[in-house]
A protein has these predicted regions:
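Extracytosolic low-complexity repeat regions of secreted or lipid-anchored proteins
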Residues: 95, 99-144
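Secretory targeting and sorting signals
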Residues: 1-26
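Extracytoplasmic low-complexity, Pro/Thr/Ser/Ala/Gly-rich segments
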Residues: 26-73, 79
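A generic structural signal for short, solvent-exposed coil/turn residues
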Residues: 17, 35-39, 51-53, 67, ...
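Alpha-helix boundary/capping residues
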Residues: 13, 81-82, 141-144
Length: 146
């Protein structure tokens, strides 16, 4: 009887030892060579009704490039806002109280990819909150102050 218990225990231990590496092998992470590199940040900035800086500009960050007139400064500003924990493309909250003032007819739209996520943001200068939001995005958006 003792011999039978020892044989069963030995067989069970051997079966368990053989099964554990097989189960663990399927959960191993992928080799680093198979992981993709982070995507370059690519934005299209379209500006209208500014009287002097209307147009469509391409802005690439990481590395800096495109035809944006202040590409390096714009990328630095976006990085600065991200380090502060701010979403530079977030709209003004609907429940936000804003001063009733008109900052001008200028409008802008930014589309593309930033930090791996899609961007589709519009900017205007139709009230105090939107004016502040525009200024926060300078030099990504042009300086409209004289």
């Amino acid at each position: 009887m003792l011999r039978r218990i020892v044989l069963i225990a030995t067989a069970s231990a051997a079966a368990l030892a053989a099964a554990v590496p097989a189960a663990g092998a399927s959960s191993l992470p992928l080799p680093l060579a198979l992981l993709s590199a982070p995507a370059e940040d690519e934005l299209t900035v379209t500006v209208s009704d500014t009287a002097r800086t209307d147009g469509m500009y391409e802005l690439r960050c990481g590395p800096t490039g495109g035809d944006h007139p202040a590409a390096q400064d714009a990328c630095d500003r976006l990085d600065e806002l991200a380090l502060e924990g701010k979403d530079p493309f977030a709209p003004v909250r609907q429940d936000q109280m804003c001063t009733e003032q008109m900052g001008g007819d200028e409008t802008a739209r930014i589309t593309g990819t930033w930090q791996g996520r899609p961007v589709d943001a519009t900017f205007s200068r139709t009230n105090g909150c939107e004016i502040s939001r525009w200024h926060t995005m300078e030099p990504v958006l042009p300086n409209t102050r004289s």
